[in-house]
Amino acid sequence: MLMITQTPEYGEDGVLVVGDVAVTPMPDAAQLAQIAVCTAQTAKSVAGFADPKVAMLSFSTLGSAKHEVVDKVIEATKLAKELDPALKVEGELQADAALVASVGQKKAPGSEIAGHANVLVFPCLEVGNIAYKLVQRLGNADAIGPILQGIARPVNDLSRGCSVDDIY
């Protein structure tokens, strides 16, 4: 999904590509890694990002918390790097560390991604769907998608809550 925000300092001039917000409820680490790689490819092909910077989101930043959900994101990050060694991906990162440069410097010093992410990968569908709808409704962002990935051509799935402006 493309999120066009009113905040140009985030993402790529206010544009973020996010996943998964519509398909896989509880992805395992391998599925999450594939989502990361596909979402970065979508960032290039659909959003025109020359340099996708992928943040694997969590409630923890680089070991600040210990939990099996965090372990899944760490494993998925490792697998994503194996699937695409050229991919710029880091995780686990909290959303503020991924998006806000000053926070990223504090929580993940030396990170190329922290504070500069333009692609966000959510740990599960529940988090992704809630996050995108909050950003869309409360942050007045335009949401384009969800875009189904991993098939021959991109497909857009419309939310029942979308407006005519969301379609066109």
Question: Regions from the language model: what does each represent?
Answer:
Residues M1-Y168:
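Anion-binding alpha/beta catalytic cores of soluble intermediary-metabolism enzymes, centered on
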